[in-house]
Structures are given as structure tokens and as C-alpha cells.
Amino acid sequence: MDALCNASEPPLRPEARMSSGSDELQFLGWNVPPDQIQYIPEHWLTQLEPPASMHYMLGVFYIFLFFASTLGNGMVIWIFSTSKSLRTPSNMFVLNLAVFDLIMCLKAPIFIYNSFHRGFALGNTWCQIFASIGSYSGIGAGMTNAAIGYDRYNVITKPMNRNMTFTKAVIMNIIIWLYCTPWVVLPLTQFWDRFVPEGYLTSCSFDYLSDNFDTRLFVGTIFFFSFVCPTLMILYYYSQIVGHVFNHEKALREQAKKMNVESLRSNVDKSKETAEIRIAKAAITICFLFFVSWTPYGVMSLIGAFGDKSLLTPGATMIPACTCKLVACIDPFVYAISHPRYRMELQKRCPWLGVNEKSGEASSAQSTTTQEQTQQTSAA
């Protein structure tokens, strides 16, 4: 009877156990079939298996992320795509970001299944799918954040020269998707690097651990083009926005002082600018979240390729993996807090959410939207 039970279990690697007296220490990969071991970097096979409770805790955490991200990003896509007042060229980038964030959460069921089976349960095929989804959504979100920064930069620093049209916004979004494609296809086809399990063997990413020149070159290249480039663009655009706002306010105060008046702004101008600033703050917050969530992962991959690999324990590498997914869950709620017109639509369509948006700022955002659409019609 015992022989029959043991036959149904996946065979263990001979080196997968260490015995010390009556205690047994299992290593990662102890429950992986022999034909799947070849896909796991040797670094992880030398690491101790974490307690089962850690797997289960991460599985439950990802269940929460999956539902929160699906609900939040689903509502953003629904409202931004069906509300006429929100259907503007600028919001095409917000919609694109929500799509990338939604795609990011679609790989959560793979992680959840692996976690509750304590390892590389679904095998290499689903590992490739998991990593492909992660590469597309992560790199795409970064480049979309840069595009949002570019758009906000033009809206706030060049209010009389808004040249963003639907055609231009769609083309920019298509370029973003095309930009992401090589970083998925190259490791997926193993033409350059490969996708492999990482950490607790429940998630997958590009190989940053193999000790060869090609791996180091790939890690350095993808780090530059998928993290450094969008980060530099984001920092440039938002630093220009902040500088413009401070200089503009300073100029208005000085002019008002010369004219011996309290302020040169009308109530309408104040309301309109408040709405624009709130939208800019939302964009800045999301870009900050992108930077905070992806920096640990970038540092981890650089350590794996160029540094001391002993620093990369399974538990340590799971933290950056979780922060990357967390930002996809938070993004839509940042807009729910900060975007006046989106809050107004939420209040109208989902009154049970208890959103209370003042009509003044939403109306000013609406007038800005109308002005944009009028300018686009004139340009056409």
C-alpha cells in the first residue's frame, strides 16, 4: 500500500534532501519532476525550501491582488472607454496603462496555483506564459507612464499649444506595444536569454543568474531600455512641470504685488488650474509608484548578473516580485482619489461606492476636455 502511495508522488532528486539526525532539510525543487529540473537555474536548487506557510501566505496575498486589480482596472477601462467626457487623447494613455495593469494581474492564477502546490507545479510552459505576460505589462506600464508624463508636460507647460490628437495618442500607444515586443520574443524563443523560474519557483522572469556574457549583456540592455529610459523621461517631464508651476506662481505673485491686488486669478481660472494640478498629481503619484515598485527588481537583476549572487535568497527575491504586482493594483485607486472627472463618473454610475466629488472641479475638468476637443476639431 505504501509503495502505491509513493508511486503517485513526483520523484525526488537524489540531492534534494539533507539528513541531520532525525531532521530532514528539503531544498527548492524537491517536488519537481526530473524532466522539469533542467529549466531551473542551479542557484535556486542549492537554496532551502521555505516553510509551507510562506507559500500559502503569498498565495492568499496574490488572491487579494488579483481581485483588487481586476476590479480597479476593470472599472477604469469601463468608465474611461464609455464616458464621453473622459474620451480624450490624454486619457488614451490612462486607458493603456489600465490595460497593462489588468494584463499584469492575469498571471496571478499561475502564481496562486504554484504557491498552493509549493513550487514549480505548472511546469515550464506556464512559466513561459507567466514571464511573457510580466515582461509585456511591466515594460509597457513604464513606457506608458513616460507617455503620460509627456502629455502632462505639454498640457501644463504649453497650454496654448496642445497638439495631442486621437491619432497621435493611438500611434504612441501602438509604438509602446511594439517597443515591448522584442523583450518578450527574444527570451521566449531563447534567441537571447531565456525565461526561468525564480525565488520560491512559483514565479518566472528572464534569466539574470547564468554566469555568461550573453546573460549579463541582456540584463544590462533590458535594464537600460525598460527601466532607465522611461525613468529618465519621467523625471525630466515632471521636473519641468514642477519648475513651470513654481515659476508661474512666482510671476503671478510679483505681478499682483505690483498692481497692489491680492490675486490675478479669477475663480474660474483657479478651479480649472486646480483640476489640472490634481490630474498632474495623480500622474506623478503613479509614476512614483512605478519607480518605487520596479527599482528593487532592477537592482536584484543587476546583482544576479554582475554582483554577489549569494545575496539573492529565495525570500529576498520574492519581495521585488510582489512589489511589481502591487503597483498594478494601486494605480486605479490613485485615479479614483485624484481624477475629478473620473470621480464624478464613479459617483454617478456606482453611488454605492460613496464617492463624493464636488461638481466645481469636475466641471472645470469638463471645460478643459471640451476645449481640447474643440482644438482637435479645428486642427482637423
UniProtKB/Swiss-Prot annotation:
Residues that bear N6-(retinylidene)lysine: 325
Source organism superkingdom: Eukaryota
GO molecular function list: G protein-coupled photoreceptor activity
CDD domains, per database record: 7tmA_photoreceptors_insect (cd15079)
Membrane topology: Multi-pass membrane protein
Main location: membrane
Miscellaneous comment: Each Drosophila eye is composed of 800 facets or ommatidia. Each ommatidium contains 8 photoreceptor cells (R1-R8), the R1 to R6 cells are outer cells, while R7 and R8 are inner cells.
Protein name: Opsin Rh4
Name of the gene this protein is made from: Rh4
